[in-house]
């Protein structure tokens, strides 16, 4: 993250918006676990490193570039499957747990930044199911009107981010602005 901080320091204006879009569900060699017997340590570590640890380290890296007297938004893509209260299907252990961990990190961050940066907003956003490599193997179960292009999803999320106020900081929201249970 040092090179990331160095690049930000070259930007001479205060940060106003950072959007984290990193995420990992599967690769050619790693599949989401359907049952307990599929869990292995390296898959858990990879999911947590990208989905939970990276977003909070990004926040840590940018904190020194935020001014308390200016509005600032930090938005991070999470996933509905990271909701403990909304888990009806089970499976996908590492992905679900890593997104739930991201949600906790960012909810906690929103409380700290409310004190340090009263005009800041931390947004935890579910973009919906997008027609990308991440969701491609699982799209057959998604209704056509709920499978978004990346551009559609971006429009929905930018609308949410642009309409939020500091009092909205720390909420877990879906692409349609509905609140997702923790």
Question: Where would I find each of the regions flagged by the language model?
Answer:
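Short-chain dehydrogenase/reductase
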Residues: 5, 59, 106, 154-157
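Conserved Rossmann-fold cofactor-binding substructure of NAD(P)-dependent oxidoreductases
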Residues: 1-14
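Conserved hydrophobic beta-strands of the Rossmann-like cofactor-binding core
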Residues: 14, 18-19, 23
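Catalytic loop of short-chain dehydrogenase/reductase
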Residues: 24-28, 32-53, 63, 67-116
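C-terminal helical subdomain
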Residues: 124, 132, 136-182
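Conserved Rossmann-fold SDR core element
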Residues: 103, 113-130, 168-172
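Hydrophobic structural elements of the Rossmann-like NAD(P)H-binding subdomain
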Residues: 19, 75, 122-125, 135
């Amino acid at each position: 993250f040092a090179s990331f901080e160095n690049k930000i320091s070259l930007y001479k204006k205060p940060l106003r918006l950072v959007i984290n879009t990193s995420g990992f569900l599967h690769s050619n060699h790693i599949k989401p676990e359907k049952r307990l017997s599929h869990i292995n340590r390296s898959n858990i570590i990879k999911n947590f490193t990208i989905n939970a640890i990276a977003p909070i380290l990004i926040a840590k890296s940018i904190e020194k570039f935020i001014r308390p007297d200016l509005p600032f938004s930090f938005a991070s893509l999470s996933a509905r499957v990271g909701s403990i209260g909304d888990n009806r299907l089970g499976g996908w252990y590492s992905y679900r747990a890593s997104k739930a961990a991201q949600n906790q990190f960012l909810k906690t961050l929103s409380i700290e930044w409310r004190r340090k940066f009263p005009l800041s907003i931390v947004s935890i956003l579910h973009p919906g199911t997008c027609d990308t490599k991440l969701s491609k193997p699982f799209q057959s179960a998604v209704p056509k009107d709920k499978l978004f292009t990346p551009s559609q999803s971006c429009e929905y999320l930018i609308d949410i981010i642009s309409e939020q106020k500091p009092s909205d900081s720390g909420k877990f929201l879906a692409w349609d602005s509905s609140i997702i249970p923790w």
